[in-house]
Amino acid sequence: MTAAVGGEEVVCAKSGSIAIERFTGPQIRRFYKNDPAAYEQTARIHLVSSFLCSVLIGADAPIDTGDGAGMNLVNIDTWDWDSELLDATAPDLLAKLPPVQPGGRGRATHALDPTPDRK
């Protein structure tokens, strides 16, 4: 991933940090390289935080911009997925990711209704 975009300095300038193996972007790259068939069958890739929100709201929850930058996949100048970092990570990655959204912009709905229907 790092070599594909021009080195650690480029990754750091784009995402705010160098690509460290434990970060999500490098882990996605590792998953793709180790098992391309399983990666191809993967429909959605979330962080735990956005996945839990998705379960609670019953829809795809966005990934916070700060979390996305910590994945080494969000550009800190545009606060959106960085196409060069995505392409260096795995093919068609953008299609597997939810949208990016600044923190503090919550969703007001949830999938779990605590009150049963009253008829």
List PLM regions with ranges.
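Gly/Ser/Thr-rich active-site cleft segment
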Residues: 8-119
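Short alpha-helix plus adjacent loop in nuclease-associated cores
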Residues: 1-4
